């Protein structure tokens, strides 16, 4: 019983620590380009050969920076648009590209296709269902086995029977605690997946072909790097054209 009390104390202390931890919010603002403020957002735009991009930082979701982006196809030809046409390049305070820890590669992150995220979430939810089913089987076997051992040792007064009863009782207690942990983790994970699934399913900035003189607006999600002081959002709509580039300053602010 002592180790169970110790386990509960650890969990309670962890919860208190997590509640007391100061949270910080990642902030970004455009630099180097003229911007306008609309609805509290700093908006920047560029146009080249009939293609116009309007962008603003819209917050953070999980490990991603979210940009509210609208792409206008003001040409007379169809234009294929994809979140993967966007890249995010983290930079240091001198606006030099950050590199991997070994210094070999320049860091850069590609935009996320919502459909791929939705497929991943569905796969992960299925994996979690299978995992909890396996855990239930293991827990049931442990509890039933422990109870049978307790019954078998009941009424016997030998030292061996006493030890068997002690082990069986411990096994049952372990299985009960494990069952609680398994179900807590399962529901927590499934809740997070459901919330993420709702976010991704509502995003309409997906790979599509824009007809001439139409536009598409939505959230573009790109992974961030906490070491960055600046970051450049690039949009490459044609291999024959220079990409659009928007420079943002990045910092963290305590909430």
State the predicted function of each range.
Residues 100-201, 214:
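Hydrophobic alpha-helical membrane segments
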Residues 13-36, 54:
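Bacterial Sec signal peptide processing site at the extreme N-terminus
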Residues 211-220:
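Short Pro-Gly-centered flexible turn/kink motifs
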Residues 1-19:
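Sec-dependent bacterial lipoprotein signal peptides
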Residues 61-68:
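Short, solvent-exposed loop/turn segments enriched in Ser/Thr/Gly
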Residues 226-255:
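Terminal connector regions
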Residues 77-85, 188, 230-234:
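Short, hydrophobic/aromatic beta-strand segments
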Residues 69-78:
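Asparagine-centered strand-capping/turn motif at beta-strand->loop junctions
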């Amino acid at each position: 019983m002592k180790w169970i009390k110790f386990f509960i104390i650890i969990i309670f202390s962890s919860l208190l620590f997590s509640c007391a931890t100061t949270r910080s919010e990642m902030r970004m603002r455009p630099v180097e380009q003229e911007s306008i403020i609309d609805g509290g957002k700093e908006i920047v735009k560029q146009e080249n050969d009939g293609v116009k991009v309007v962008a603003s930082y819209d917050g953070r979701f999980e490990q991603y920076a979210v940009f509210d982006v609208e792409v206008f196809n003001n040409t007379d030809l169809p234009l294929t648009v994809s979140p993967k046409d966007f890249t995010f390049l983290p930079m240091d305070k001198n606006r030099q590209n950050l590199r991997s820890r070994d210094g070999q590669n320049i860091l850069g992150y590609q935009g996320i296709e919502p459909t791929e995220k939705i497929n991943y979430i569905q796969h992960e939810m299925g994996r979690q269902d299978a995992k909890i089913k396996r855990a239930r089987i293991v827990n049931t076997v442990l509890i039933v086995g422990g109870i049978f051992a307790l019954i078998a040792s009941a009424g016997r007064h030998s030292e061996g029977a006493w030890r068997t009863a002690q082990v069986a009782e411990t096994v049952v207690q372990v299985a009960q605690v494990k069952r609680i942990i398994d179900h807590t983790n399962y529901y927590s994970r499934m809740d997070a997946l459901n919330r993420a699934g709702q976010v991704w399913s509502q995003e309409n900035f997906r790979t599509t072909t824009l007809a001439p003189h139409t536009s598409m607006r939505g959230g573009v999600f790109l992974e961030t790097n906490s070491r960055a002081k600046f970051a450049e959002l690039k949009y490459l709509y044609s291999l024959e054209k220079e990409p659009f580039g928007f420079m943002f300053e990045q910092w963290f602010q305590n909430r």
